[in-house]
Amino acid sequence: MRKKQVFNPFLPLNEYIPDGEPHVFGDRVYLYGSHDHEGGYTFCMDDYTVYSAPVDDLTDWRKERVIYEADQDPAYPELCYMYAPDVVQGNDGKYYLYYAMSGDYGVGGYTCPISVAVCDTPAGKYKFLGHVRNKDGSPMMRYVCFDPAVLNDDGVIRLYYGTQYDYEEQPDFPENDAYVKQEMEMFGRTREEILSYPDSIMGPVMLVLEDDMLTVKEEPKHIIPYKVKGTSFEAHPFFEASSMRKV
């Protein structure tokens, strides 16, 4: 029998998956995202779970499994929650999960490198692989490592991330020390680090990864202006949760 209607919400009423990232792998679409707890006191308290449906029948969703748990990350339990993730198929055919850790109410969520986990299947049990790193092996901490999105662009692995507030748009920045101190507290950086960026430590950035899915191949750079006043982005500036699609 032909189905004529798709209902929303399509997930169970006690399931909360914000920051949704749907991806088609094979003949199914997989929905990845953060995982809020019903009645929870802060963001993203539950481990990552995945739902999927046939690409030709988006009424037939099923819960796959919990694919990754916060305590698999070495930052746990100091940071015990996982924020907006993304998944990509690498050039080796494996699946790679990118995410950032955080604490209660987002505390600490801007202070750690981007974590990576790997699995042989889209909805299997992912294993911690490592952190995005510089060529010398040190953790990559350029700009604010938050809410990653990743794209396999015909074999080129592009990683997008960042967050944005308007502190540095204020006419008295950095003379008004309150703005600098706010960034120091939020991002876990020194004053010298904050002011060392010729553009800004904030804003949406992109880097290119090696095929190992961890090592930086091309250094991060802004993809749109951080300072949006007077630009075409002024009415809709970037905030967070990069989500990229190739069209």
Range-by-range predicted roles:
Residues 1-247:
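Carbohydrate-active catalytic/glycan-binding domains of CAZyme proteins
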